[in-house]
């Protein structure tokens, strides 16, 4: 490998660009599927409704567990009673769907007209008998992924502070099952418990698909670490217990608000680890959790080497190439670190917002990766100005630009390879085994262009019309 220049420390800059991202109410798209007994009510205008329909499809026949409470002129001019209107809607939701929790998603409009959702919710909750969680996931945020951050921070307040005393009732219901498993169950339970090391309770936070949750839980189980719970859980009624002194660790880089809430409000201890994205990140995440609990990690070297060996067919396509992040979903630093490990040069990491405390371990790992791979450190640009970025793209001529959807087609028309950053949000990218999916996404535009070149379709030719 030829070293372009001496690796340098990360250089941080802040521009004054506009935020080019989806609205954070899009978090409903994955959270309503994750929390199976929930109902999401977005309180906003027609614009919010159009956005939700476009982002998630109309889904008329699927009977989705989300709805739009559309504000009308009477709401905005204070002619209608907010409480009465919301009560009518929530009673209908309870009658039709009977969820375990209703999540009110505030929007820009509810902020502007100063709608007191937090004041209305407790009173209505008492009347309905269903928990109502209020999350202000409005478009005033930096990135659309922060919608999830807002919802999880609100849900952290609802986590029980001690284990529920419902075991006796459960035992009575399972009496027959107990009889069938007599002489066997206790041994199995004891054997399973003996696989774990004695350590303080650990709760992981971040919404991931169920297969990925299982993978990460099993990876920690191999090290003798028991995961006490996940926030969010599959069901609202199964939210993890959070007592003072519990340890928490995040799986996504955009959850700084949730981390702050868990530390300040619930008095939990945050494990400041890199995020489990890519084999290197997953290994560092597990190692950090192990080090906090005083456990020596076992077999991680072999596990990581095995994964890298399996990725070689993709890595050879991007080794030595350059990538430019325009900034969209706050996953940029983690993806940049992984791509540096794959042999790419990251020219710039644009990011809408950077919480340097929450991402400290990830930033340190990115800097270390650049030094070890012998590539220059990227320029870190917070709140980038897109006009300036486009000029820098013309100057640097990267092999790939990872960008929001708004800029993808204009850049492609100018002969620049692009990849939609939103795809990384919805793909399964966490853990050892899903690293292949990241590279599948990254290499797709490069492979497509190679195929077009093989066919001789790499040039646009304008011909005069023949009459």
From Swiss-Prot:
GO biological process: light-independent chlorophyll biosynthetic process; photosynthesis, dark reaction
EC number(s) per entry: 1.3.7.7
Gene3D superfamilies, per the entry: Nitrogenase molybdenum iron protein domain
InterPro entries, alphabetized: LIPOR_BchN/ChlN, Nase/OxRdtase_comp1, Protochl_reductN
UniProt keyword annotation of Cell inner membrane present: no
CC cofactor: [4Fe-4S] cluster
Residues annotated for [4Fe-4S] cluster binding in this entry: 23, 48, 108
SUPFAM superfamilies: Helical backbone' metal receptor
EC top class named in words: oxidoreductase
CDD domains linked: Pchlide_reductase_N (cd01979)
Keywords: 4Fe-4S, ATP-binding, Chlorophyll biosynthesis, Iron, Iron-sulfur, Metal-binding, Nucleotide-binding, Oxidoreductase, Photosynthesis
Pathway assigned to this chain's UniProt record: Porphyrin-containing compound metabolism; chlorophyll biosynthesis (light-independent)
Keyword Ribonucleoprotein annotated: no
Cofactor note: Binds 1 [4Fe-4S] cluster per heterodimer. The cluster is bound at the heterodimer interface by residues from both subunits.
A molecular function (GO) term: oxidoreductase activity, acting on iron-sulfur proteins as donors
Catalysed reactions listed for this entry: chlorophyllide a + oxidized 2[4Fe-4S]-[ferredoxin] + 2 ADP + 2 phosphate = protochlorophyllide a + reduced 2[4Fe-4S]-[ferredoxin] + 2 ATP + 2 H2O
Subunit structure comment from the entry: Protochlorophyllide reductase is composed of three subunits; ChlL, ChlN and ChlB. Forms a heterotetramer of two ChlB and two ChlN subunits.
Function text: Component of the dark-operative protochlorophyllide reductase (DPOR) that uses Mg-ATP and reduced ferredoxin to reduce ring D of protochlorophyllide (Pchlide) to form chlorophyllide a (Chlide). This reaction is light-independent. The NB-protein (ChlN-ChlB) is the catalytic component of the complex.
Protein family membership: Belongs to the BchN/ChlN family.
Protein name: Light-independent protochlorophyllide reductase subunit N
Annotated source species: Trichormus variabilis (strain ATCC 29413 / PCC 7937)
């Amino acid at each position: 490998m030829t070293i372009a220049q001496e690796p340098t420390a990360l250089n941080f800059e802040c521009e004054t660009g506009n935020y080019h991202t989806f609205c954070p109410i899009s978090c409903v798209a994955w959270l309503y599927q994750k929390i199976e007994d929930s109902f999401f009510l977005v309180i906003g205008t027609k614009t919010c409704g159009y956005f939700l329909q476009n982002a998630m499809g109309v889904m008329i026949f699927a009977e989705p567990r989300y709805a739009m409470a559309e504000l009308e002129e009477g709401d905005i001019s204070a002619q209608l009673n907010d409480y009465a209107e919301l009560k009518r809607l929530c009673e209908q939701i309870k009658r039709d769907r009977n969820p375990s929790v209703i999540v009110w998603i505030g929007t820009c409009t509810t902020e502007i007209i100063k709608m007191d959702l937090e004041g209305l919710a407790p009173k209505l909750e008492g009347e309905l008998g269903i928990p109502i969680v209020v999350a202000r996931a409005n478009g005033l945020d930096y990135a659309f992924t922060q919608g999830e951050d807002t919802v999880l921070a609100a849900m952290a307040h609802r986590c029980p502070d001690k284990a529920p005393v419902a075991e006796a009732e459960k035992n009575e219901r399972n009496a027959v099952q107990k009889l069938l498993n007599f002489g066997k169950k206790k041994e199995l339970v004891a054997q399973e418990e003996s696989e774990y090391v004695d350590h303080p309770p650990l709760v992981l936070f971040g919404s991931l698909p169920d297969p990925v949750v299982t993978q990460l839980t099993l990876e920690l189980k191999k090290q003798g670490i028991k995961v006490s719970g996940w926030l969010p859980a599959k069901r609202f009624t199964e939210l993890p217990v959070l007592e003072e002194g519990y340890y928490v660790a995040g799986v996504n880089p955009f959850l700084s608000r949730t981390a702050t809430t868990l530390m300040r409000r619930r008095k939990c201890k945050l494990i400041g680890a890199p995020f489990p994205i890519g084999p290197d990140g997953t290994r560092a995440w597990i190692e950090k959790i192990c080090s906090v609990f005083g456990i020596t990690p076992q077999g991680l070297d072999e596990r990581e080497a095995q994964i890298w060996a399996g990725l070689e067919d993709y890595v050879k396509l991007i080794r030595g190439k350059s990538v430019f992040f325009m900034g969209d979903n706050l996953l940029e630093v983690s993806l940049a670190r992984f791509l540096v490990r794959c042999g790419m040069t990251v020219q710039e990491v644009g990011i809408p917002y950077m919480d340097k405390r929450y991402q400290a371990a990830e930033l340190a790992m990115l800097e270390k990766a650049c030094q070890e791979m012998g590539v220059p450190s990227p320029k870190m640009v917070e709140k980038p100005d897109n006009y300036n970025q486009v000029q820098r793209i013309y100057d640097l001529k990267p092999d790939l630009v990872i960008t929001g959807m708004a800029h993808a087609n204009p850049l492609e028309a100018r002969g620049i390879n692009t990849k939609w950053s939103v795809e990384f949000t919805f793909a399964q990218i966490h853990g050892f085994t899903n690293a292949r999916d990241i590279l599948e996404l990254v290499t797709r535009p490069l492979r497509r262009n190679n195929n077009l070149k093989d066919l001789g379709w790499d040039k646009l030719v304008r011909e005069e019309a023949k009459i």
